[in-house]
């Protein structure tokens, strides 16, 4: 796993294809799916058809869980990879009152803020129960 993905996030659970991680940014419920495939895979189309289906199933399951649990205005899903090329998918619960709305989380000039330890641990516990 690219160290930039690992260092800025916390493992929640393993799914059939992907490791599911919480991004350390208190502004949003922000989950990253990191498929356990070769690091040379940088695009979704490079996955096998079966892996593509598994990834779409995981994105759908995660989006649905975040939507029902957090009640956001919108779920943002993206696979950019301009900075970290290893294939990974961002699934972010967004609210009209969040500090970046309506821009993307990358466009807005809002510094990331880490979770307080207690809040982070509690959220990881909730997400593990929700996503296991």
Language model features with spans:
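HIT superfamily nucleotide-processing domains
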Residues: 1-87, 91-132
